[in-house]
Amino acid sequence: MVTPSPPGNHSLSLEAPRLHTASDLLGNHSLGLPLITALVGSRDRRGRVFSPVPVPLPTNPTTQHPTRQKLPSTLSGHRVCQAHGEPVLGLCPLLPLFCCPPHPPDPWSLERPRFCLLSKEEGKSFGFHLQQELGRAGHVVCRVDPGTSAQRQGLQEGDRILAVNNDVVEHEDYAVVVRRIRASSPRVLLTVLARHAHDVARAQLGEDAHLCPTLGPGVRPRLCHIVKDEGGFGFSVTHGNQGPFWLVLSTGGAAERAGVPPGARLLEVNGVSVEKFTHNQLTRKLWQSGQQVTLLVAGPEVEEQCRQLGLPLAAPLAEGWALPTKPRCLHLEKGPQGFGFLLREEKGLDGRPGQFLWEVDPGLPAKKAGMQAGDRLVAVAGESVEGLGHEETVSRIQGQGSCVSLTVVDPEADRFFSMVRLSPLLFLENTEAPASPRGSSSASLVETEDPSLEDTSVPSVPLGSRQCFLYPGPGGSYGFRLSCVASGPRLFISQVTPGGSAARAGLQVGDVILEVNGYPVGGQNDLERLQQLPEAEPPLCLKLAARSLRGLEAWIPPGAAEDWALASDLL
């Protein structure tokens, strides 16, 4: 006998067996519709079998929410189900069986900051393109490549980057944000917010409102290197069949001296996550470490603060404690005989390709600065050179002039940071961090606009023209900056990266852009067309006319313009 449920409960119940609501059985599918549960009975060898089936109630078809799915008609004379024999019990009129699709992305998760922990495989990128919109603060994900870490971790087109690791970057220069992401390779934690949510928050709270959750000062996971002594590593692991695991320290033991906090949660061993390890697997991993081991741990305060903020306990957030080695920052000033070293591209001891320093001459600037033969070059002027070819790396060094800042690691440090899968640039001491040259940028195209400037000294159309074809470099950049003056005649090249695609194609500072991919430049849609260039298939075809630097300086007073990035960078 079927009895109606109490008011407010959309399920039907039998005296036996007990029937749950549809949401209990199938979960909330965020359809925005009330559900009732139809009871379907069928005959088989065991007799009658009853199974609940969720059915949406009739609703006004004209009332829809943009985030809700459109449902089929809910009233029908068809039978509910015919999977196991002829149905013998159901609703009247009979309602069709509606099979819910898989869970769509939670729309509410897009309304708050999200955390994407990306990892990069050797020779590949994180899998997304970053762009700064013209005339607006912030940095936008303009494309996510399928099958990449960015896609797997939920990064979406239109997301705005609020923070890189624990550093808020929303109001930083575009080039600085690109530099931070590249310097964090092979792992980076991005805090992002969907574009529509960001726009609403800014409209309601103002441009200076703090939208990004970050850890407090000194509250960060720790990367601790422990060397075994007569008492072992100086910790034991809480017993359980599977992670998570917490550490119990021996007073005065090796772990305590290495900076492991009391009651710390164990996250990684030698760069490998132990979150899903069994206790036996963890024991074996520690035993295989030999006489020393590197642990990523989080103290109780860090764990609690991350839980409250929703932050993952991610390795790129870590600070180093008692590390066996660290990167070195070398400052060189060229002498009469040069810098005194040779840069060579080769594979390291671990098989990874890179740029290595050899033939360090005694008595010359490189040796005096502390360079050692066999050092791997990590960065030039604070900018990572990972993934760059030999020629582009040489060009970056030459572009620094007579004073060069190089970040290097010796073979031991190279092996260590490769093992823990973290960039050595994350562990530079603040006093050693090299300052990047002012105005440097990884953006491939930049637009400058200052309506206060007037062109009074040069003709509007330069004479002569030539055509250049450009292909993007390893970082997705064409290697030049494009500027203009609102009242000036044309767009012009304001900077060319040495060794980049633009330099190889023959672009020079002062060249004026006449055409881009066959379209004349000089109309009202120039900026819109430039913003679409990152999506265009290479090569980039530019028709140029030369202008002398003298004429350029007369046209644009030094320091009179401000750059906005237009094109995207592959990260």
UniProtKB/Swiss-Prot annotation:
Could you tell me what this protein does?
A: Acts as a regulatory protein that associates with GUCY2C and negatively modulates its heat-stable enterotoxin-mediated activation. Stimulates SLC9A3 activity in the presence of elevated calcium ions.
Predominant cellular place of this UniProt entry's protein: membrane
The subcellular location is: Cell membrane; Cytoplasm
Could you tell me in which tissues this protein is expressed?
Expressed in kidney and the gastrointestinal tract. Not detected in brain, heart, skeletal muscle or cells of hematopoietic origin.
Q: How does it assemble?
A: Interacts with the C-terminal region of GUCY2C. Interacts with the C-terminal region SLC9A3 and the interactions decrease in response to elevated calcium ion levels. Interacts with the C-terminal region of SLC34A1. Interacts with USP2 isoform 4. Interacts (via the third PDZ domain) with SLC26A3 (via PDZ-binding motif); interaction leads to decreased expression of SLC26A3 on the cell membrane resulting in its reduced exchanger activity.
Q: What is this protein called?
A: Na(+)/H(+) exchange regulatory cofactor NHE-RF4
Q: Name one Pfam family in it.
A: PDZ
Keywords from the UniProt entry: Cell membrane, Cytoplasm, Membrane, Phosphoprotein, Repeat
Q: Where is the composition biased (Low complexity)?
A: 433-444
GO cellular component entries: apical junction complex; apical part of cell; apical plasma membrane; brush border; cytosol; plasma membrane
Q: How is it modified after translation?
A: Phosphorylation at Ser-395 negatively regulates its interaction with SLC26A3.
* Gene Ontology biological-process annotations: monoatomic ion transport; negative regulation of cGMP-mediated signaling; protein localization to plasma membrane; receptor guanylyl cyclase signaling pathway; response to toxic substance; water transport
Which parts of the sequence are annotated with region: Disordered?
52-72, 432-459
- Domain of life, per the record? Eukaryota
Alphabetized PROSITE patterns for the sequence: PDZ
Q: Does the keyword Repeat apply?
A: yes
* Keyword Aminoacyl-tRNA synthetase recorded: no
Q: Which parts of the sequence carry Phosphoserine?
A: S395
User: What molecular functions are annotated in GO for this chain?
Assistant: guanylate cyclase inhibitor activity; ion channel inhibitor activity; protein-membrane adaptor activity; signaling receptor binding; ubiquitin-specific protease binding
